[in-house]
Amino acid sequence: KTEQKKEFQTFEEFKDAKLGVLTGSEYDRLTKELFPDSEKFQFADVANLILSLDADKIDGFLLDSAYYSAVGWEREGYKSIQSDNTTVSYAFMLSESGMAKKVKGELDEFITDMKSNGGIETLAEKWLSGRKPTEFEDYSTLSGENGILTVAVSNSDMPLSFVSEDIARGFDVEIMIAFAKEYGYKLNFAPVDFEAKLGGI
């Protein structure tokens, strides 16, 4: 957050700062590794991290570029300090029961195809470019001839998955919608808090 009282310019200046951490995330490990002497505060989601930053309860927090691209959707006055020293990987997690093995194979194939045909880049431009999208994919009319997939989504992890007006939206959500269209599934999105995702699976 940019303010008159203190403006951090480098990673090193955060070494003894008050830092927010997304509970159970890779940022927890990275914060401990990069800033072992900092004071750390746990938060359930990115929205509460930002609110605490606004209230001066924390000085900052680690966030990947995907999440940061949505910070400016509703608010202004923030800055980021870029670092190429760390990377965070993403994946879709499936349970080991039911038709998960079949779905995993299909999803792996579909994402590989999206990477080669430009589908991922199109969604990235829509969701990760810093501009708030105004048009969304409709998943209410999916055919479902091959079954129904229940998909856990975060309530407020913009721009990847979040719920707005009782509708699931986001980069991850639209990947799943495109997948369901291609393979004949219907989607039941189940909003959960971040820490409840694994339990739901």
In which residue ranges do the predicted regions lie?
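Short, well-ordered beta-strand segments
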Residues: K18-V21, F61, M93, L149-S154, ...
